[in-house]
């Protein structure tokens, strides 16, 4: 009997409306991988941040339609991947770390569907404790609860096929832009305390 396998694309998530911004921020700062403080102190600091930042964040979201575009693009990626019949995965879906559908909801649904193996694909090409570490930790916790085997594809941006494809698109864009075009590489930073704790994100 073959094992039913599913692939889950996992992203941070985002608010689908301005009403969801405060709960979204609260969920982020409740994560010890994001805000590594003792539980009570983390809750206190989280509430302070959310109270102070919600309105300014709402104003910025209103400039882009009042919701996160990440939701639309993640769903589009899943639909495109489903077009190609996978010889390995019977089902391809998505989950978010901080908004619905959450990893918890997705694992429960997969368990109900009889899936015994779940491969997690974080939608970040790098590895970082705060992002991919949080996702992998939560996935392992839920896999244990539902008796599902789980795997995580980590730091996939280092694969030579991905780099070659990115180079191809970049060269095409540079050729189209013409002489004088410049490429700006932008990356998230992480607190130095995380680097000292062994997070190798800067090396990526």
PLM region descriptions:
Residues 2-204:
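Active-site-proximal alpha-helix that buttresses catalytic centers in soluble enzyme cores
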């Amino acid at each position: 009997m073959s094992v039913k396998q599913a692939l889950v694309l996992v992203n941070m998530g985002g608010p689908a409306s301005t009403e969801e911004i405060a709960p979204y921020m609260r969920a982020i700062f409740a994560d010890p991988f994001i805000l590594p403080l003792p539980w009570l102190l983390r809750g206190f600091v989280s509430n302070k941040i959310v109270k102070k930042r919600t309105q300014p964040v709402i104003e910025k979201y209103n400039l882009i339609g009042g919701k996160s575009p990440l939701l639309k693009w993640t769903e589009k990626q899943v639909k495109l991947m489903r077009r190609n019949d996978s010889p390995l995965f019977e089902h391809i879906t998505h989950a978010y770390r901080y908004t619905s559908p959450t990893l918890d909801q997705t694992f429960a649904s997969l368990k109900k569907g009889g899936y015994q193996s779940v491969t997690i694909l974080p939608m970040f090409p790098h590895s970082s404790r705060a992002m991919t570490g949080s996702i992998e930790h939560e996935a392992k916790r839920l896999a244990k609860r539902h008796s599902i085997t789980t795997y995580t594809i980590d730091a996939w941006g280092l694969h030579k096929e991905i780099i070659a494809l990115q180079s191809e698109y970049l060269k095409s864009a540079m050729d189209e832009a013409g002489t004088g075009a410049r490429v700006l590489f932008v990356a998230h930073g992480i607190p130095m305390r995380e680097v000292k704790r062994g997070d190798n994100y800067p090396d990526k």
